[in-house]
């Protein structure tokens, strides 16, 4: 038997042996009824990133913030959501209602300046981003809130 015949024979035996291996059964789980992440999963990091100026109807503009949420310390288990400051305000109000005896950190103050003036101020927007980062970190990484329906609603809507 030549070397090439032996290699071909070995390869055929490997394929034949693989055909004898039974497939591992697939287990499907319905996660829709729980309304939130798997109970063993948890948010391990939250990063408030860049802001984006969106042109609204009638020429008005507003800012949305990108928020990356990392689950179980895996970059592959992360999502990016985009939220306006007013969305985050409503999120905080929902947390206060759902957890009346828990101290929820404040948001950075809402400024009364015009949007045109704010859009010129990178310094002001960076301070707002830092304040939002502090708020999101303190809320989303708090073990009391990890599986809160309020957080799930904020992330998924």
From Swiss-Prot:
Entry-linked CDD domains: PX_YPT35
GO annotation terms (biological process): protein localization to membrane
GO terms for MF: phosphatidylinositol-3-phosphate binding; protein-macromolecule adaptor activity
Location, primary (coarse class): membrane
Record has Transcription regulation as a keyword: no
Subcellular location: Endosome membrane; Vacuole membrane
Origin superkingdom: Eukaryota
Pfam families registered for this protein in UniProt: PX
Disulfide bonds: none
Lipid bilayer topology: Peripheral membrane protein
SMART domains named in the record: PX
Annotated SUPFAM superfamilies: PX domain (SSF64268)
Any Gene Ontology CC annotation: vacuolar membrane
PROSITE patterns, sorted: PX
Domain PX: 43-157
Family as reported in the entry's similarity comment: Belongs to the YPT35 family.
Domain remark from Swiss-Prot or TrEMBL: The PX domain binds phosphatidylinositol 3-phosphate (PtdIns(3)P) which is necessary for peripheral membrane localization.
Stated name of the protein: Endosomal/vacuolar adapter protein YPT35
UniProt source species: Debaryomyces hansenii (strain ATCC 36239 / CBS 767 / BCRC 21394 / JCM 1990 / NBRC 0083 / IGC 2968)
């Amino acid at each position: 038997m030549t070397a090439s015949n032996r290699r071909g024979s070995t390869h055929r035996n490997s394929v034949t042996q693989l055909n004898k291996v039974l497939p591992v059964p697939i287990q499907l789980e319905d996660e829709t009824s729980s309304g939130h992440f798997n109970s063993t999963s948890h948010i391990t990091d939250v990063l408030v990133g860049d802001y984006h100026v969106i042109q609204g109807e009638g020429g008005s503009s507003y800012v949305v913030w990108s928020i990356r949420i990392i689950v179980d310390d895996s970059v592959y288990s992360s999502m990016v959501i985009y939220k306006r400051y007013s969305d985050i305000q409503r999120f905080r109000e929902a947390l206060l209602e759902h957890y009346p005896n828990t101290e929820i950190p404040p948001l950075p103050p809402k400024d009364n300046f015009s949007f045109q003036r704010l859009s010129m101020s990178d310094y002001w927007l960076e301070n707002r981003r830092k304040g939002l980062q502090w708020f999101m970190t303190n809320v989303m990484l708090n073990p009391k809130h990890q599986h809160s329906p309020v957080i799930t609603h904020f992330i998924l809507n």
